[in-house]
Amino acid sequence: SFGKNKERFDVKIAVMNFSGNVGKTTIAAHLLKPRMPNARIYSVESINAGADASGVEVEKLRGKKFGSMIDAIMMLDDAVIDVGASNVEDFMKMMQQYDGSHEEIDIFVVPTVKEKKVQADTVNTVRALRALNISAKKIRIVFNKLDVEESPSEEFPSIYGLASGEKACIVSDAATIRMNEVFERLKSHGKALGDLLEDPTDYRQKLREATEQAEKEHCVQMVALKRLSVTANENLDQVFKAITK
């Protein structure tokens, strides 16, 4: 297990997949950042909006600045590197060039969703990381966007096979982010999950006092969002525990 105690969680995590649209930003902004409050977030991105669209401050980097990023990371206790799909290949080339640089990263999180093409890309991402001599136990899969009743081992047989057959990565049923509309709704509000959880406003009380229809609707929405955010947060706690143990 990483980290000395609950308050100081020292770990450096890279998030990547050759496929886009796997919810990388949800993972950087909502899963990792709130549980690693001191972490600096690096976004290695040439085209995507990245984590800054989710109410989280990021440092933007193009793939070529790899060397200076690795130097900076060596000085930090914890960091999150959010690598855009179109930059993964460059990022891996750089890791190869800067031999041993992957040792500065404790965990490679590879998020995936059910689509067949994405699953194939996920297998390729894991194999490419292994080809760089990154140890399988540092490569952790996060299954994203599964309904509550869906089982990851049934939905992702090829990835479970990769873990058991090739021993190429670590999979765990607990590392599953369940579908929750709170993530989409947060995106449209430009807020992070933590903002909702820490919002002290009693919206049910406000609803009773509201006179305008629009304000009433806003209060009802906020009550629902806060309820969803509690469920999402418990789910993410479980996922974080699974990928960092």
Locations of the language-model features?
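Conserved C-terminal guanine-recognition region of P-loop GTPase G domains, centered on the G4
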Residues: 116-144
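Glycine-rich phosphate-binding P-loop
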Residues: 13-28
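Inter-motif core of Ras-like GTPase G domains
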Residues: 92-115
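G-domain G4 guanine-recognition motif of GTPases
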Residues: 18-19, 112-114, 139-156, 176-190
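Short beta-strand-centered segment that lines the nucleotide-binding/catalytic pocket of NTP-utilizing
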Residues: 37-50
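Beta-strand-loop-alpha "switch" segments that mediate conformational coupling across diverse proteins
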Residues: 158-220
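A conserved segment at the C-terminal end of the G1
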Residues: 25-38
